[in-house]
Every structure is written in C-alpha cells, then in structure tokens.
C-alpha cells in the first residue's frame, strides 16, 4: 500500500492535479492495517483532502475501539470514505463515521457490469440501497442516506453546493412525491431534468 500510494501520488495526482480513490476490499484486521498505512502515507505526502477510500469493508468489521482509532486517523488526514452499499459485503457504519468527523459519500460502482448487475445510475435508488443495507427506518435516517448520494458527492468532487437558492447551479430534477423519504423509497419517474438551467429530459425521455 505504501509503494502504491507513493507511485499514484507521483505519477497521477501530481502530474494531473487529481485526487486519488483507493478501492479497499480487505476485511477485518488486514483491512484496518491497510487503512492505517493509507493514512500514514497521506500525511507523509501532504495529501490531506486528496485521498478517498472506496468500500473500506473493514470499518464495519473491527471492534468499536479500533473503529474509533481508524476514524480519528481518517478525520485528521481528511480522507473520505465512499460506499456503493454492495449486497455481498459488510457496510461501514456510515452515520458513526460522520459523527466522528469523517467525510462520507455514496455512489454507484460502475453502474452495471459483470461485477454487479444492480445499478441504474439512479441516485434515489442508490440512496434506497444505502438505507436498506444500513437498516435505516426513520425519516431522518433515510434523508441522511440520501444526503450521502447528493450533497456529499458534490462536496467530494468539489462541485458548487446546490441548495436551490439564487446563484446555485441550476441542476435539479422534478418528481411527484410528498417528501424526501418517500422519494427514496419509491424513486419515482423524473418528470423533468434540468442541467445548467436547460431542460434535458421530460417524462423519462431525453430531449437532446
């Protein structure tokens, strides 16, 4: 992991001025050890805020004391944890990470391919997967899961915040739903999709 991160920092991050996302599948203690190494090299290379770890299953497999130790390292080095809520692995405790000050986001892992057929690019659907795998039942929990798929993703990608206020990017969708939790549970058809203020899809049909 040390040599890998050093090489990525030298050959990719510096050269192209990009962030690094490491997909970490190792479980339990070996995964925790890998997270420690990533945090160590992030600090040594001065890459705070430029590294993310996707999956990080080990965070959901270690004792609470070890989890808090790892979360502190992640928070100090500004390392983001990203999840796609895969069905075959232990999910990191997302809310507990946020409570410890760790940046967390959620997204799709290659949308749909031989790795997993369960993806459509629909982030409302992905938020439902997050909530289902995390056993979120209360409205505020479901909304938290949605926030990882929406605002947290924009923050990670360094995109402008979008609260539908004056000056925000005019990127938004229109759906028919009584509230956000219901929208996550049903992920209804997008009546309209706007990008930069331009209507690009209506009633499920692209307009370009």
Which residues does each predicted region cover?
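Short, solvent-exposed amphipathic alpha-helical segments in soluble enzyme
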Residues: 7-14, 38-39, 98-99, 121-123, ...
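His/Asp/Glu-enriched, well-ordered alpha-helical/loop segment
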Residues: 40-51, 78, 95-177
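C-terminal cap of metal-dependent C-N hydrolases
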Residues: 166-208
